[in-house]
Amino acid sequence: MWAKTWACGQKRGQNVPMSYVVIFRSTRKLDDGQLYSEWSEKMEALVKTIDGYEHHFGFRDAISRDGVTVSYFTSLEAISQWKNLNEHKMAQQLGRDSFYEEYSVQVCEVLRDYGFEA
């Protein structure tokens, strides 16, 4: 399932401010998911407190357990603030220890934003 999102609530093609995107790709370990769900909810609430956070969306394939989360921020400073929050650092360590078989992170600058809407 793909989610459709627009930066800052604006439609594509309008004067959208500079954005940066963090792409988090991961493969979940096999587990009951309870602790993961708890931490996922905590992190979802926490990221929304970052000045410069815009929005995010994600999806995960139930069979392969591969997932992608795409998060939008207005600045590299906001991304750094998010990365270095103590509670987020605890979640990162839990991810390495308990939640993920592997993951990768890419930080990208949005150069163009356009699309089609019927």
Where are these predicted regions, by residue range?
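Short S/T/G/P-rich N-terminal loop/turn motif that feeds into the first structured element of a domain
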Residues: W2-G67, L76-N84, Y100-A118
